[in-house]
Amino acid sequence: MEQFRNIGIIGRLGSVQVLDTVRRLKRFLLDRHLHVILEETIAEVLPGHGLQTSSRKMLGEVCDMVIVVGGDGSLLGAARALARHNVPVLGINRGSLGFLTDIRPDELEVKCAEVLDGHYLVENRFLLQAEVRRHGEAIGQGDALNDVVLHPGKSTRMIEFEIYIDGQFVCSQKADGLIVATPTGSTAYALSAGGPIMHPKLDAIVIVPMYPHTLSGRPIVVDGNSELKIVVSKDMTIYPQVSCDGQNHFTCAPGDTITVSKKPQKLRLIHPLDHNYYEVCRTKLGWGSKLGGGGD
């Protein structure tokens, strides 16, 4: 297994618990004589840290691994910045859910030691890339680990749009919006909209309409290498938005085209050896426990 010597730390701002965990993590890594680099925004709220700092954009170039302290949202932001560097990312959960940041703070030293000793799993999670075009010209571009969402923004009116997959017309829809999600994002917004849960190893994309004005509107799962095109109706009088992971936003105009496809670079997500995807789903989604007398 790959050995890690240069460790980057990213932390969610605005949380005392995150800062406490970052300090613990820093001490633990330094005690192992590792080179620690702080992302510059978290470094600003840790006076006297005495460590090298780096912008998030450059962190992937100087680190063997990056540890994210925060919730799933923190890891989503880190993933978009770090995927192009092919640097592994490990998450310590200081959020409310923790689908992606799966190390609990109370097990920080034990689990991080296992990873640093070479005992870990690596998952390659693909991202989506979205581009908004107007009159043939690109006006916005963003990446997403979870989902690309077309939504009305501040308006409460429905959106009319057409969907094309690999150049073939699929359907027109009138709905509150459309979610295009990766397997990683299938347990996020897409799940709330009635989409299926997809195992992270699947090479597939799910298209989930949001409150479609029809009884036949259902999610569609397509090949992960598909190119999706969403055309906003020219007859619209509102200006909907496109959001990537709920963090990057672009305003669309009637007639705009949104293209969504798989990003070439993938996120290398690290887990401890005892990571179990179904246990995560069972714990986070409140699935029932094993019945007495059930199978092993």
UniProtKB/Swiss-Prot annotation:
Catalytic activity: NAD(+) + ATP = ADP + NADP(+) + H(+)
Residues annotated as catalytic: 72
EC code(s) of this entry: 2.7.1.23
Any one GO MF annotation of this record: NAD binding
Pfam families for the chain: NAD_kinase (PF01513), NAD_kinase_C (PF20143)
Keyword field contains ATP-binding: yes
Primary localization: cytoplasm
Gene Ontology CC entries for this record: cytoplasm
Cysteine-cysteine disulfides: none
Superkingdom of source: Bacteria
Top EC class for this record: transferase
Subcellular location, record wording: Cytoplasm
Keywords, sorted A to Z: ATP-binding, Cytoplasm, Kinase, NAD, NADP, Nucleotide-binding, Transferase
Similarity remark: Belongs to the NAD kinase family.
The protein, known as: NAD kinase
Naturally occurring in which organism (per UniProt): Pseudomonas savastanoi pv. phaseolicola (strain 1448A / Race 6)
Organism taxonomic ancestry: Bacteria, Pseudomonadati, Pseudomonadota, Gammaproteobacteria, Pseudomonadales
